[in-house]
């Protein structure tokens, strides 16, 4: 009887172990098929604060008056070309980070008082998107962002003015893509 009980116990343990391995294998296989959680989302409340919305749009309006190059748009249809809707927030994260690091921070002593309020707000959005990544091919995104960066660099200070003058478009595009 004891031998039969031991035999059943080993058989049961073997079945249990095999079942666990099967479950782990199925879980791992399913995990490969699921997209990685990208955390590419912003809360709508970020875009519903009248004061900062007003300051952002006022900064863009003030600076756009100094923009002499009205033939070029940095944020528009071309920027989103070839980028699926689900990846547009990641694209806008890249544009936001470039705008902050290469345009706004070097120009932060200008266009006061708006700049001192808008830069921390946009930095907060950038921090909220810090874990935003895509798991697929980002070739079109990188190409479009590279084109935007090259345009700003080619235009020099005029390109920086244009980027600041389009902060309203950046704001709206972030809201549309990330909320």
UniProtKB/Swiss-Prot annotation:
Localization terms from the record: Secreted
User: Which cysteine residues pair off into disulfide bonds?
Assistant: 40-132, 89-178
Q: Which InterPro entries match?
A: 4_helix_cytokine-like_core (IPR009079), IL-10_CS (IPR020423), IL-22 (IPR020453)
Recorded GO CC terms: extracellular space
**Glycosylation sites recorded in the entry for this protein:** 54, 68, 97
**Which residues does UniProt assign to the signal peptide?**
1-33
Tell me, what is one Gene Ontology molecular-function annotation carried by this entry? cytokine activity
> Any idea what job this protein has?
Cytokine that contributes to the inflammatory response in vivo.
Record the organism. Answer: Mus musculus
Q: Which family does it belong to?
A: Belongs to the IL-10 family.
Q: Mind telling me what this protein is named?
A: Interleukin-22b
User: Which Pfam family, just one, is annotated for this protein?
Assistant: IL22
This protein's source sits in the domain of life called Eukaryota
Sorted alphabetically, which keywords does the UniProt record give?
Cytokine, Disulfide bond, Glycoprotein, Secreted, Signal
Where is it mostly found?
secreted
